Structures are given as C-alpha cells and as structure tokens.
C-alpha cells in the first residue's frame, strides 16, 4: 500500500508573452505587488487548491466547476465577470495546470490571458517510497508483458 500527495510548486504565467507580471511567481510575490486575485478550477477535490490560494489571499473569489469540465462561453463569461469585479489595480487569475491546458487555445479566453497564472503540482510518495513503487511497476512490466524480452533488454 502506497500513500501519495500533491505539493504545490511555483506559479507560472499561463501566457508569458501576453504581458504577465512575471513568467514565474509565487503567491507571496503577488501579495507584495498588491495583486487582487481570483481563482477557478474544474478538479475533483477543489478544497485543497482554493485553501492554498486563500492562505495568502483570504478574500479571493473562487469559481468551482466540476471535474473534467468542458468550459463553455457562459463559463468563461462567469470567470470574466468575477475578474472584472476585482478592485482596480494589479489583477491576477490563478488556476490549475489542468484547467490552463483546457483553456489555453480557447479564443474566448483571449482577453484574460495576460492575467492568468497556473500552479505547478508535484506528486510525491509519503515516506519516500517512490523508488519502491517504481521498481514494483518496472518489475511487473518486465515479467508480465508480451514484450517482456524487450523490456528486460532495455533495463
């Protein structure tokens, strides 16, 4: 039995060529720049993400969509309206890497691209069991695939 978790990493500008404040940032840096921000996500367990944002920005509005959500024009209008309601000044939108990937080529999202940041995540194993897990998977594949001989020769 293995236990894993998510660690939040850096904030990355979703569209660094569109005028973001910086290509890479942190919530603390955005706080120092006196940014007003909101967040949105469409993930299975949004509480962790929203809680992470609200540790630094307790008043940040959050829009929550269902997991694997296919964003429509009406959803993007909700995001845009929430963004417009933020106080004037430096404004940012924080989302997940998954949601950024869903929206990055959506032309309806174009107006918000200079303000979008997404959070990088890292999956980690509790008690440093990553090597044990990887060996278990590699050994299984090596011994239980049609191409077991090829798998053995590559490792």
Please describe what each predicted stretch is:
Residues 1-155:
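ATP-dependent carboxylate-amine ligase
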């Amino acid at each position: 039995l293995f236990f894993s978790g998510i660690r939040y990493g850096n904030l990355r500008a979703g569209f660094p060529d569109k005028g973001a404040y910086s290509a890479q940032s942190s919530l603390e840096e955005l706080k120092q720049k006196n940014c007003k921000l909101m967040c949105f996500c469409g993930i299975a367990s949004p509480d962790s993400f929203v809680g992470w944002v609200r540790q630094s920005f307790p008043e940040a509005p959050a829009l929550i969509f269902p997991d694997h959500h296919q964003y429509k024009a009406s959803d993007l209008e909700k995001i845009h309206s929430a963004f417009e309601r933020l106080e004037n000044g430096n404004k940012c939108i924080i989302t997940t890497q998954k949601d950024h990937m869903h929206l990055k080529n959506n032309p309806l999202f174009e107006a918000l691209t200079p303000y979008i940041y997404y959070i990088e995540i890292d999956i980690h194993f509790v008690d440093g069991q990553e090597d044990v897990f990887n060996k278990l998977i590699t050994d299984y594949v090596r011994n239980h695939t049609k191409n077991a001989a090829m798998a053995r020769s590559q490792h």
